[in-house]
């Protein structure tokens, strides 16, 4: 009967194996953290795109100096809108990736705690069986040819099923994670396209010193320029000064903010943007957006946006209400609403 031999040497080998696996796990964790940090750096670049709105508006204004065709201006604005949508998509993808990384780190942390509590165990019965097999192999090696001896020497100890190997590289797991990311991206894009195709009713007021209220139906993905074009078509028959005007001569004022033409209604809806006197993501109309008891408490109500000629604004921008209007800045936050 075989006897158990080499307990000290086996313990030393087990200790070396544990140290080696711990070192591999630490290297893998460092690689994961490095990849996550690189993704954060890339995502931080995406956060800066909103600060370029003023530069974009300035570029559009400079490009319309002189004789510039409406088609050229539309092409530039459509290109800016597409770029905006790409940036939003990248930002959402990064959020999903960060969430997955946080979950993965939490799982690794829990597994690490379990490993510290539970000691590495070896099945002594399997060791005895291995020794019995080795004794039989030594006897049979004397009779076996050299080729058979080489094959037997290649035989290694079996893997311990109780040891956690989740921290080791796994191609199948990585492919599954990539597949999950792609499914999330496609699902998010499909959801956004569905939102953009939804129809909304826009209430606006043509302002020439007094208000003339109208309503038009648009899709959430339409730009402010497309909205002004449709509004202009409905107003031309009633206002002679608009019959020769183009969409580039109109301004859209929402909650005392001058909204650039290249923005879409979708931009304000998904970001829950706010203006000086109410939310920018609601386009129906109520009498007031402030509670009588507390002017700082916001309600989901808004004022009708104003459509004005740029020439009228230049002549009357020192007079109320035009004196309150200012260009929209996505970086500026309006924590409370006021009336002067």
Swiss-Prot record:
Keywords: mRNA processing, mRNA splicing, Nucleus. One of its GO terms (cellular component) is nucleus. GO terms for biological process: chromatin organization; mRNA processing; RNA splicing. InterPro entries: FAM50A/XAP5_C, XAP5. The keyword Transferase does not apply. Residues 1-22, 123-178 are annotated as: Disordered. Signal peptide: none annotated. Residues 124-146 have a biased composition (Acidic residues). Residues 169-178 have a biased composition (Basic and acidic residues). Pfam families: XAP5 (PF04921). The gene is fam50a-a. Its main location: nucleus. It is found in: Nucleus. Probably involved in the regulation of pre-mRNA splicing. PANTHER family: PROTEIN FAM50A (PTHR12722:SF0), XAP-5 PROTEIN-RELATED (PTHR12722). This is Protein FAM50A-A.
């Amino acid at each position: 009967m075989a006897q158990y031999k080499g307990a000290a040497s086996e313990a030393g080998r087990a200790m070396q194996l544990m140290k080696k696996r711990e070192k591999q796990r630490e290297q893998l964790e460092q690689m994961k953290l490095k990849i996550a940090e690189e993704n954060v750096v890339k995502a931080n670049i995406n956060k800066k795109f909103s600060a370029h709105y003023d530069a974009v508006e300035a570029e559009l204004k400079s490009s319309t100096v002189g004789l510039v065709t409406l088609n050229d201006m539309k092409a530039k604005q459509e290109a800016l809108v597409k770029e905006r949508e790409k940036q939003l998509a990248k930002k959402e993808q990064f959020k999903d990736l960060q969430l997955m990384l946080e979950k993965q780190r939490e799982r690794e942390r829990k597994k690490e705690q379990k490993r510290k509590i539970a000691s590495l165990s070896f099945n002594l019965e399997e060791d005895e069986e291995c020794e019995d097999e080795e004794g039989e192999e030594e006897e049979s090696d004397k009779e076996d040819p050299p080729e058979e001896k080489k094959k037997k020497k290649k035989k290694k100890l079996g893997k311990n099923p109780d040891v956690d190997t989740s921290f080791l590289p796994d191609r199948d797991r990585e492919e599954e994670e990539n597949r999950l990311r792609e499914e999330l991206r496609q699902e998010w894009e499909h959801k956004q396209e569905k939102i953009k195709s939804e129809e909304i009713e826009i209430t606006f007021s043509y302002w020439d010193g007094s208000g003339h209220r109208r309503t038009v139906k648009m899709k959430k993905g339409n730009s402010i320029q497309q909205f002004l074009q449709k509004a202009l078509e409905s107003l031309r028959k009633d206002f002679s000064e608009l019959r020769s005007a183009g969409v580039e001569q109109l301004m859209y004022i929402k909650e005392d903010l001058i909204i650039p033409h290249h923005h879409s209604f979708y931009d304000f809806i998904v970001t829950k943007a706010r203006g000086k006197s109410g939310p920018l993501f609601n386009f129906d109309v109520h009498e007031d957006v402030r509670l009588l008891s507390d002017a700082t408490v916001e309600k989901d109500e808004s004022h009708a946006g104003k459509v004005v000629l740029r020439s009228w604004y230049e002549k009357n921008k020192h007079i109320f209400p035009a004196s309150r209007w200012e260009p929209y800045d996505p970086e500026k936050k309006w924590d409370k609403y006021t009336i002067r």
